[in-house]
Amino acid sequence: MSEIALTVSLLSLVAVIGLWIGHIKVRGVSLGIGGVLFGGILVSHFMTQYGVKLDGHTLHFIQEFGLILFVYTIGIQVGPGFFASLRQSGLKLNAFAVMIVGISGILVILLHKIFDVPLPVILGIFSGAVTNTPSLGAGQQILTELGGESITAVMGMGYAIAYPFGIIGILLAMWLIRIIFKINVDKEADEFDSATNNKKDGLSTMNVRITNPNLNGLMLQEFPDFELHEVVYSRIKRNDELFVPKVHTQIQIGDILHLVGTKTALHKMQLILGEEVNVSLSTKGTMYRTERAVVTNEKVFGKQIRQLMLKGKYDVVISRLNRAGVELVPNGQMTLQFGDVLNLVGRQEDIEAVMAIIGNAQQKLQQVQMLPIFIGVGLGVLLGSIPIYLPGFPVALKLGLAGGPLVVALILARIGSIKKLYWFMPPSANLALREIGIVLFLAVVGWKAGGNFLNTLLSNDGLAWIGYGAIITFVPLIVTGLVARIYGKLNYLSLCGLLAGSMTDPPALAFANGIKEGNGAAALSYATVYPLVMFCRIILPQILAILLWVAG
């Protein structure tokens, strides 16, 4: 059997066993995708006994490529909501994440001083305990710069010992917090969805009768602050006639307007217009219809809604715009992106004409544009390879193969499309690539750790190393988790994403995502803290190495 065939076969075996382990539940809790790591350790242990070895370069490529796929698809998934999240709760989340990083750094110093743990060992344990491979590389580089090249190899051993238990510690922290606070996951998910919809311009409707005499005879576009209130006038009822208003429609006293917008904007507009009334303005039984259409025509990507001149040509109004699950109030300045879902109100023939303009080709939503994926991955790898020089540091910092693709994916997902290129990915395709990536990554990590795992575990102070790693992993997580839940009132699912992101741990994120399928809280908080945490995790071992090396 060729080297490639042997590698693929054994990693497939690792994936099968690991995924099976991950499905085993103990009191309703399972390792999930993290089981692949232990599948790798198990298979590697027995294969080593028979002298089976795999090519290191091949394994390294598979591991890094899997990680790139995982973080890139995560960025594409959460990108549309990431920047809004920064404005809403990002400061709090990042503060807690930095708290976790800071506590772990303090613990490294204490363990090094109290138990006289060699510097290369404690730095390796630190990197494994926080499940951060770039941290290991940064620590090895700085030790080499400081003249310790001959002892950096031991860092890898400390990393391998601490890494598996680093993942367990994160899952254990999530589980204990769930037990301590008697968390109802469904309730937490509902609260997150409700709060997120409110924060992200979740839309409501209101019917208002015009009673303000100052508005009589005015056109809609002449209303005070017409564009600033972020309200859509989707229907108007005059006597018994229902029709779709246009910007030049003249308003009369007694007209009833159907408004769409945020609750705050609706209330402000109601104070200007008149009184709220409980009157039906349904399109049922009339010549008007309400339809949902998807933007798929590349000719309208990046165009402002007003450039389509729908209100001038057609008896149609766009009452809502849904982008990546977030409902927005459409206005003339808003640009259209691939996958935007528009709520159209108007005559059937006019709605059909508008659908023809924007595309509404549902099958395109299931198609994957491969070119943007490889452009994004390539740009991400380039960004991760750019050295960042800071005064006083002998080694250039880098985002690496994990941080670079993530940052690029977040930006591209936020942009949405550039001419004919769009970075929308069907959820099924995104999930498939993400799961394949994390399985490849974990299978290789488990294989590398499993060969001499038991020997290392039972010798060379292996048990003590495990203890140090467990402290570095667990204490910052549980302390910050308790503080965030009690004083920060953080949603449990968001907290799980925070814990996973603070350790830059994809398996923990996969576990957190599995706590409540289909809820994006964990992924969103993970992506919110990941860029800053990755930067801190790369810098911290260098700072620790310099401080502890100088201190002797």
From Swiss-Prot:
**What is this protein identified as?**
Putative transport protein HAPS_0158
* Pfam families per UniProt: Asp-Al_Ex (PF06826), TrkA_C (PF02080)
Q: Which BP terms does GO give this entry? A: potassium ion transport
Q: Where do transmembrane segments lie in this chain?
A: 4-24, 28-48, 65-85, 95-115, 157-177, 370-390, 393-413, 438-458, 463-483, 492-512, 532-552
Extract one GO molecular function annotation from the record: monoatomic cation transmembrane transporter activity
Instruction: Tell me yes or no: is DNA-binding among this UniProt entry's keywords.
Output: no
GO CC field: plasma membrane
Is the Membrane keyword given for this protein?
A: yes
Q: Which Gene3D superfamilies match?
A: Regulator of K+ conductance, C-terminal domain (3.30.70.1450)
**Family indicated by similarity:** Belongs to the AAE transporter (TC 2.A.81) family. YidE subfamily.
Paired cysteines (S-S): none
Q: Which UniProt keywords apply?
A: Cell membrane, Membrane, Repeat, Transmembrane, Transmembrane helix, Transport
Where is it mainly found?
membrane
Q: Subcellular localization, per the record? A: Cell membrane
Q: Where is the RCK C-terminal domain?
A: 193-275, 277-360
InterPro entries noted in UniProt: AAE_transporter (IPR050144), RCK_C (IPR006037), RCK_C_sf (IPR036721), Transpt_YidE_put (IPR023018), YidE_YbjL (IPR006512)
What species was this sequence derived from? Answer: Glaesserella parasuis serovar 5 (strain SH0165)
The annotated topology with respect to the bilayer is: Multi-pass membrane protein
UniProt cross-references to NCBIfam families, sorted A to Z = PRK03818.1, YidE_YbjL_dupl
